């Protein structure tokens, strides 16, 4: 935490230091509004949801990686 708010020249940084805000995790909006950057808040909704498993997909290794695929017992190559 910052405790040397008298040595800071900018009034915005004085305000940050006065409230003992850690400048490493805070940014200042140009209009003078304090925005706290929290990594937990920046996680998108898609990242919060668990990954869904594929329904009816191929079991085992990915066949497209090896250049062949099996359809109803018949192997096709593409």
From Swiss-Prot:
UniProt superkingdom: Bacteria
Pfam families in the record: DUF1674 (PF07896)
PANTHER family the UniProt entry points to: SUCCINATE DEHYDROGENASE ASSEMBLY FACTOR 4, MITOCHONDRIAL
Family under the similarity heading: Belongs to the SDHAF4 family.
Protein name: UPF0369 protein RF_1112
